[in-house]
């Protein structure tokens, strides 16, 4: 994938995909084999680790949707973006900020996630 915006959109599509084989196919498309994902709650390596993390988030926040919260800013194989998790109408329940490293093959090799707004008890 050459377009960073499209890459990030596809990455978020993986977080919204509830069918495991389809989600795994999207992750293979957008992540390197050994991609690392780290946020305040989890640190995993590889697509299987992120797939399990996504499944757990979907179980906790069923029915909610990830969306871009603004523009994607990118340079030198690095991109940053804000994302929202919510119902699609009204204020999002969770707001986060991710920084991704993009490998030479155009796929994401690392995600560093930050949680800006989270519900109590998460």
Identify the role of each PLM range.
Residues 2-19:
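Short, aromatic-enriched amphipathic alpha-helices that serve as compact interaction elements
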Residues 12, 16, 31, 58, ...:
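Generic secondary-structure transition motif, activating predominantly at the C-termini of alpha-helices
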């Amino acid at each position: 994938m050459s377009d960073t915006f499209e890459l990030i959109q596809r990455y978020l599509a993986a977080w919204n995909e509830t069918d495991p084989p389809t989600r795994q196919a999207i992750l293979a498309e957008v992540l390197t084999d050994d991609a690392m994902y780290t946020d305040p709650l989890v640190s995993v390596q590889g697509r299987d680790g992120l797939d399990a993390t996504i499944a757990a988030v979907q179980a906790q926040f069923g029915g909610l949707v990830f969306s871009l919260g603004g523009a994607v800013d990118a340079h030198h194989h690095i991109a940053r973006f804000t994302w929202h998790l919510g119902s699609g109408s009204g204020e999002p329940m969770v707001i986060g900020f991710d920084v991704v490293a993009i490998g030479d093959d155009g796929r994401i090799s690392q995600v560093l996630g930050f949680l800006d707004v989270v519900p109590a008890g998460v």
